[in-house]
């Protein structure tokens, strides 16, 4: 398994358990149907799955799955004549069948971080459709021990913009925090934009929400939108990055804008894991891929 080591810097670094020390090249790529711009324009795309090692995970927790922007659907041959499901509905079982058996998981306890945008229109003829992602959350909740997550700007939950209920092992975050396996997660849903539109806030509002969440001493900050990464050309918001660099170092998991490199480190030691259109499993350094 090829890994890209994270260079050490002479700066304050992440405290606690969640410092990422390496991230692999994709160990598998799952084919799926991606939407085109008109009827019949859909095509087969691939979802890469990476393994990231962290310095420490709480006792009893073997892995955390992080993903976002799974805006596709399963292939027709996998649907067995049924309506094709969202990629996020089928991914939980695919990971169990093809990825998790390759890892050393003494307890089998796994958590999930969902960073938003899991909908694609059934006809696969439109990019950026908005719709119900409740079944994605339910599917991950059935297969894994707990979920934390935020809404993307294309997500609804039934006829509601945010969940009126969720699986008992799931925590929906929009300026809230939740603790699972001693890790405190905080989250901000939506993106920066016109606040009169679905799941959008002004940049000032978005930054205020981040400050509120981080003030609760979060270990992991989950965002849909997020900071840029100028050193590697990663798209994002400059003001969010500048704010995060003034706050205590943390691990940020974000989606919304795809980066060529999934991991960046800000000037204050904050790490940003970009999971847009990819899936990353965070495991202990001692976990081996068979």
Predicted regions mapped to residue ranges:
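Short C-terminal domain-edge/linker segments immediately following a structured domain
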Residues: 95-101, 143-145, 178-182, 214-220, ...
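Cap/insert and terminal regions of metallo-dependent hydrolase folds
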Residues: 91-99, 119-120, 124-133, 221-263
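Short beta->alpha connector loops
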Residues: 48, 70, 93-95, 129-133, ...
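Conserved beta-sheet core of the metallophosphoesterase superfamily
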Residues: 146-149, 163-169, 230-290
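Conserved catalytic scaffold of divalent metal-dependent phosphoesterases
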Residues: 51-57, 64-75, 104-105, 118-123, ...
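Active-site surface patch of divalent metal-dependent phosphodiester/phosphate bond hydrolases
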Residues: 128-146, 150
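N-terminal active-site segment of His-dependent metallophosphoesterases
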Residues: 3-135, 208-217, 222
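A structural signal for short coil/turn segments at secondary-structure junctions
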Residues: 107, 142-144, 247
């Amino acid at each position: 398994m090829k890994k890209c080591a994270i260079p050490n810097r002479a700066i304050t670094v992440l405290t606690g358990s969640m410092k990422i020390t390496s991230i692999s090249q994709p160990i598998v790529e799952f084919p799926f149907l991606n939407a085109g711009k008109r009827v019949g324009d859909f095509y087969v795309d691939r979802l890469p799955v990476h393994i990231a090692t962290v310095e420490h995970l709480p006792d009893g927790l073997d892995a955390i799955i992080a993903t976002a922007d799974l805006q596709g659907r399963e292939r027709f041959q996998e649907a067995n004549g049924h309506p094709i499901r969202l990629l996020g509905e089928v991914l939980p079982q695919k990971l169990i069948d093809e990825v998790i058996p390759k890892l050393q998981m003494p307890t089998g306890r796994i958590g999930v971080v969902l960073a938003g945008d899991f909908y694609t229109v059934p006809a696969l003829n439109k990019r950026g459709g908005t719709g119900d992602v409740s079944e994605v959350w339910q599917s991950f909740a059935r297969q894994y021990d707990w979920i934390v997550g935020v809404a993307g700007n294309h997500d609804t939950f039934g006829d509601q913009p945010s969940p009126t209920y969720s699986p008992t092992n799931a925590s929906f975050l929009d300026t809230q925090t939740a603790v699972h396996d001693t890790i405190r997660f905080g989250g901000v849903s939506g993106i920066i934009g016109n606040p009169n539109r679905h799941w959008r806030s002004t940049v000032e509002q978005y930054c205020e929400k981040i400050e509120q969440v981080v003030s609760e001493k979060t270990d992991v900050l989950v965002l849909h939108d997020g900071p840029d990464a100028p050193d590697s050309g990663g798209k994002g918001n400059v003001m969010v990055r500048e704010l995060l660099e003034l706050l205590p170092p943390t691990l940020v998991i974000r989606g919304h804008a795809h980066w060529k490199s999934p991991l960046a480190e800000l000037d204050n030691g904050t790490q940003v894991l970009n999971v847009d259109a990819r899936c990353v499993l965070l495991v202990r350094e001692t976990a081996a891929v068979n």
